């Protein structure tokens, strides 16, 4: 029992992290502001850069220094709310600054973990360590799936359930961060947030966050997911020798001894005689945000056991309500995965090989499983239509909200969006859908420029030339031709193949159609 207890222990921050005073420091708001400018490719908060100034930050800090201000705003929140209802800009500044503050202990933990990847005495970095650092890109998930999933049979496609109340998010954070003032501030912020019910009742993948407080609530949600996700890591590491008599060690760690008996009563009948079914060395777990995939080489019975385990574990020990329609068990041979803005599938391909043995010739058919990824064209067009680049049928339209910008700014924004989409979907097995998306953006840019000049697209391009747009829509093939200037055939072949990049940390905003 002591062995399992030590395995479940996490390196939480046992010391007191006095982070709350940082909310009154001006440089924290400057850091949050710089992060916000580099985050959005659509530049939805274009006015945020114009409104931000250190003078506004100083006035906000002065108001927060008033000891009675927070008390008055709490007692009279319906008449004079501190933020979130009447002053969205203050809410944006405070939430983004506070999210930067809350991430400091976790960033320090990451830095301490990366210390092992420093240069050795010979001045070289170990290759295994370097590969581990590159795995921070979400494109590394597809290279992993490409290598592993083609040999598996079943997949458990799960939308992670949401917590019943946001206070559960704060309690999960309490065991990682020992700072009572900061946690009280989190509770106050959630109380003032006027639309907090939508965060836990959305039907989308994971909580539905407002644009203003997105980073802050994603931080809370991810800290909660990591809390129970570490249990699954423990289960996977111990699966080779886990027996039914030791299953009670899988109790939720916050109340390690208090819930042992209750766990045994609830799940003993389901798992006591069949725990050997979890000793599956081909079980693979992948998660991004609110969606996870569990793939196995076992039978459908194995996947149903895992399904039953997840539902009971979430509901009994993390107070998460899981609905059956959020969990799907599918066979990989006839099902496509909708994951990370790609449609992924495993298809069986046959090839005929001519063999010769002595004087005899014969043909043999070899069947292999190939992992394919495609751009979901219909959801992508829906995202473009929602952002007013085209209509629902995919016909490009002008971007009306950008008409007041200069021509160079309009072209720069459209070109940046097209390049980012091309960069993110470089792993697609078929580039025709991606070419259609780029065509929609290019024609939408032309119509926006023509409308700003009160002209037609044909007349505008006749005056300025089509080269005006081509300059800002550099394709991946042209980029590769610069890398391989003497081998254009190599660059064309590389462009037609799937390419996974190691510098992508999040889903493209337009590609995130969930």
UniProtKB/Swiss-Prot annotation:
Q: Name one GO cellular component term.
A: chloroplast
Entry superkingdom: Eukaryota
What is the organism field in this record? Answer: Trachelium caeruleum
List residues traversing the bilayer.
none
Name the record gives this protein: Maturase K
The entry's localization annotation reads: Plastid, Chloroplast
Location (main, coarse)? plastid
Which family, according to UniProt? Answer: Belongs to the intron maturase 2 family. MatK subfamily.
A GO molecular function annotation here is: RNA binding
The Gene Ontology biological process annotation of the record reads: mRNA processing; RNA splicing; tRNA processing
Please state the gene responsible for encoding this protein. matK
Lineage, top ranks? Eukaryota, Viridiplantae, Streptophyta, Embryophyta, Tracheophyta
Entry keywords, A to Z: Chloroplast, mRNA processing, Plastid, RNA-binding, tRNA processing
The function of this protein is: Usually encoded in the trnK tRNA gene intron. Probably assists in splicing its own and other chloroplast group II introns.
């Amino acid at each position: 029992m002591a062995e399992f207890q030590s395995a479940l222990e996490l390196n939480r921050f046992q010391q007191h992290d006095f982070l709350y005073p940082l909310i009154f420091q001006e440089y924290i708001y400057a850091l949050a502001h710089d992060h916000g400018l580099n985050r959005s490719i659509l530049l939805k908060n274009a006015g945020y850069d114009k409104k931000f100034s250190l003078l506004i930050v100083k006035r906000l800090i002065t108001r927060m220094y008033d000891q009675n201000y927070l008390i008055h705003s709490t007692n009279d929140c319906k008449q004079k709310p501190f933020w979130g209802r009447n002053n969205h800009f203050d809410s944006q500044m405070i939430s983004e600054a506070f999210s930067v503050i809350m991430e400091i202990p976790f960033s320090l933990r990451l830095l301490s973990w990366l210390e092992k990847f420093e240069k050795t005495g010979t001045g070289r970095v170990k290759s295994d360590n370097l590969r581990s650092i590159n795995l921070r890109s979400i494109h590394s998930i597809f290279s992993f799936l490409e290598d592993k999933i083609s040999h598996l049979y079943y997949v458990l496609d799960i939308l992670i359930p949401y917590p019943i109340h946001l206070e559960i998010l704060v309690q999960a954070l309490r065991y990682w961060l020992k700072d009572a003032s900061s946690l009280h501030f989190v509770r106050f912020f959630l109380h003032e947030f006027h639309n907090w019910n939508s965060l836990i009742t959305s039907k989308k993948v994971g909580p539905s966050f407002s644009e203003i407080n997105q980073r802050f609530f994603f931080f809370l949600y991810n800290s909660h997911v990591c809390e129970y996700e570490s249990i699954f890591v423990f289960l996977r590491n111990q699966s080779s020798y886990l027996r039914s008599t030791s299953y009670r060690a899988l109790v939720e760690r916050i109340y390690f001894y208090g819930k042992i008996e209750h766990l045994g009563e609830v799940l003993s009948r389901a798992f006591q005689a069949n725990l050997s079914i979890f000793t599956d060395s081909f079980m693979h777990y992948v998660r991004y945000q609110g969606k996870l995939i569990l793939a196995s080489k076992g039978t459908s019975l194995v996947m149903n056991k895992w399904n039953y385990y997840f539902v009971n574990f979430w509901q009994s020990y993390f107070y998460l309500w899981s609905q059956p329609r959020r969990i799907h068990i599918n066979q990989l041979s006839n099902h496509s995965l909708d994951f990370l803005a790609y449609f992924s599938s495993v298809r069986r391909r046959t090839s005929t090989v001519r063999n010769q043995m002595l004087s005899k010739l014969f043909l043999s058919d070899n069947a292999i499983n190939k992992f394919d990824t495609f751009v979901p064209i219909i959801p992508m067009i829906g995202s473009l239509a929602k952002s007013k680049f085209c209509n629902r049928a995919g016909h490009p339209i002008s971007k009306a909200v950008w008409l007041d910008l200069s021509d160079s700014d309009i072209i720069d924004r459209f070109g940046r969006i097209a390049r980012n989409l091309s960069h993110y979907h470089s792993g697609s097995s078929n580039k025709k859908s991606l070419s259609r998306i780029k065509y929609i953006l290019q024609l939408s840019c032309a119509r926006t420029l023509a409308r700003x000049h009160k002209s037609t697209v044909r007349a505008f391009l006749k005056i300025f030339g089509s080269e005006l747009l081509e300059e800002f829509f550099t394709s991946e093939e042209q980029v590769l031709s610069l890398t391989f200037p003497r081998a254009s055939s190599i660059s064309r072949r590389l462009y037609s193949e799937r390419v996974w990049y190691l510098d992508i940390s999040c889903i493209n905003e337009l590609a995130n159609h969930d």
